[in-house]
Amino acid sequence: MSMQKTNKTPLTLALIVAIGITGAASAAVHLSDDGQGQVLIYPYYTTRAGQDTYLSVLNSTALSKALRVRFNEGKNGREVLSLSVYLAPYDIWTAAVVNTADGAKLMTADKSCTAPALPVDGKSFVNFAYWGAAIEGIQKSGGDGATTSLDRTREGYFEIIEMGTITNTAINAAITHASGVPANCAVVQATTMDMGPASTLVMGGQSARAFKATGGLSGTASLVNVAGGTDFGYAPVVLEAFSPSLAENIWDYPGSIFPDLTFADLTSSVLYKGNVVSSTWNKGSDAISALLMHDSIINEYVLDDTTLSGTDWVITMPTKRYNVPVHDKEKGTDDDTQLLSPFTSKFWGRGSGSYNGACEQIANFWVPPDSWNREGGNYNGLGFPGDPFIGQRLCWETNVATFKDAQVLGSANAESVPVPFEHGWVRMLFNSVGIPVVNGQTDGNGVVHSQAAHSLTSVNGDTYFGLPTVGFMVQDFINQNAAPGVLATYGGNFNHKYTTRISRLPP
């Protein structure tokens, strides 16, 4: 065979040399370079504008896996549904997020074991994590000033985390398929089931504890609009060596808010200009931020009048919820909350302008994103003719930058981006500095800065510039010359390109 386990990519080899290991699975947490790993971050789900989101996760290994699947709404990253999924060797789990009269729900015809069991007619997303009176500070639940409506569940992002591998013979037999159906899902759905690192449960004469996560997970997602005839398919961002090397497993009970991205190894490895930057952190979510930090996003746009084309960019910041506190901005300086790097604004979901969400500036507030046409013509002035510029911000955890308000995805978290050309490309910069903030901005190394900036510094002094983002571009086209009665709508999507800057090496 032309592809073998012994073939190593440049990133894997660089990590092996830099960290002194014999296999990438023992390395610090890093981005996977082969599309498989322990954690999958899916930048976007939506049920808006006639779309449903179809998803899959594949276990390509000979080991059974315990997974945590978590859906987060897009405004402030609050959990709207989580469940455990148990995959037998070589198994795939598939599901869909679909629209309801009130919000969104998860449906599946897949037979793989979940805990809890999913109803035949699906499980509705809930608003428990953002319901009630506003609670100031960095919280996982409570009001945040934004709407408590279930409509908020209709778009966001989701993550799948490997909690561990299953070595218990009886549990393995229960989740393994026979004639297409697992033998006994009730085993893993029982309230007495405990596979955690402190478990004393014995089944079939063996400990029920899960063993270390080993990776080998991959996945897909598709934003499907049946009536519109479009399908925007994408692959998730994949993290490898997520679990700390000394952790036996990170399993937790169904319904728990854990594990999440804070459970990551406290050392991150990033390949930068041919060298591996290995940084140490006080919390796991900062290690994940380091992997995703970019000081600019680069991608294309198409706004062709003939084909009625439109372009949206999805931009999700999956570690924002760990660093941005809720604070009623109408209280002004009466503020006991603490903002954490690399974000520069606190969250309040009610109001207008900078009071709405936790807004991050795109480049200089008064200067639009740099834009080029297809012939290399550049425009980066103080405003586009016919498009008064008022400053672009990304205010939510999951954002949609919609070019000239094209609204391809119909997002409620959209920010319209003015551009001077019909076709071209944009470089969206994240380089804010000197942002006033009450109580300052606490950096990744514990230093409190009097003003906030788009940067994150590790315990060992590496500074990463920009914001931690994942996402992609979508564009649609309509063939107005197609035969009568023929649906002639087309769609395409493309991953963002990025620039990265780390202070350890020359910029």
Regions found by a protein language model. Name each.
Residues 28-58:
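A structural motif detector for short, solvent-exposed N-terminal "entry" segments of globular domains
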Residues 88-93:
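Solvent-exposed, conformationally flexible loop/turn segments
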Residues 29, 82-85:
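Beta-strand-rich interaction surfaces with strong enrichment in secreted/lumenal proteins
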Residues 1-26:
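Gram-negative bacterial Sec-dependent N-terminal signal peptides
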Residues 21, 48-49, 62-63:
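Intrinsically disordered, low-complexity regulatory regions enriched in Ser/Pro/Gly/Thr
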Residues 85, 96-98, 102-507:
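Long, compositionally biased low-complexity segments
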Residues 58-78:
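Short acidic, flexible loop segments centered on an aromatic residue
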